């Protein structure tokens, strides 16, 4: 289980305070107004910023003192962050070794990851030779090839057209279920949350105002701001 206990972070005069428990293997949609703290939560978990107080832990192991590279997270953002001068094969391989010194077994892992996301035919191409959706598949393969139990996704498919976004969401759900990966995904789309999430966390004014099973995310919820958010999104 991933836990955040009284995790406090100050940005200028704004306080972000998070308490959350995430069961292993669940897919959690992080939702809420812009600027509420969704990306801040992911940045704290990833180690890009440090909390002033509180604890973050995975199965009892404290994460606060670990560097970003030591933490058990793979990350995927709206910007695919591919290296333009590297082939698809090498961009995926970076998920296994930053110096691209792969064993034969790791090379097979790269090819398998590419096949699972449907880009095995493009392994020797450069990113500029791919479509936007194909580039995001490369980024997803690099995320998937890493042996981490948790994925942090920050609106990774929001720039894609609706059909392609649905395809990528289905792919994330499929891959996560196959490997029992825990997923925390920031999204502004209620349809995305309903499509793949098992749970949701509604973030408002720097704190987790409501959370629970995705089925409870409806107009009958007891939290008024969440109901307003839900009605605006429908």
UniProtKB/Swiss-Prot annotation:
Report membrane topology: Peripheral membrane protein
Residues involved in ATP binding: 32-39
Enzyme Commission number? 7.6.2.15
Occurrences of domain ABC transporter (ranges)? 2-230
One GO cellular component term: plasma membrane
Q: Name one GO molecular function term.
A: ABC-type thiamine transporter activity
Catalyzed reaction equations? thiamine(out) + ATP + H2O = thiamine(in) + ADP + phosphate + H(+)
- Supply the alphabetized keyword list: ATP-binding, Cell inner membrane, Cell membrane, Membrane, Nucleotide-binding, Translocase, Transport
Positions of disulphide bridges: none
The record's section on InterPro entries has: AAA+_ATPase, ABC_SmlMolc_Importer, ABC_transporter-like_ATP-bd, ABC_transporter-like_CS, P-loop_NTPase, Thiamine_ABC_ThiQ
Subcellular location(s): the record lists: Cell inner membrane
Please state what class of enzyme this protein is.
translocase
Instruction: State the NCBIfam families in the record.
Output: PRK10771.1 (NF008039), thiQ (TIGR01277)
Q: How does it assemble?
A: The complex is composed of two ATP-binding proteins (ThiQ), two transmembrane proteins (ThiP) and a solute-binding protein (ThiB).
* Function, as annotated: Part of the ABC transporter complex ThiBPQ involved in thiamine import. Responsible for energy coupling to the transport system.
UniProt family annotation: Belongs to the ABC transporter superfamily. Thiamine importer (TC 3.A.1.19.1) family.
PANTHER family per record: SPERMIDINE/PUTRESCINE IMPORT ATP-BINDING PROTEIN POTA, THIAMINE IMPORT ATP-BINDING PROTEIN THIQ
Protein name as it appears in the record: Thiamine import ATP-binding protein ThiQ
Give the source species: Vibrio vulnificus (strain YJ016)
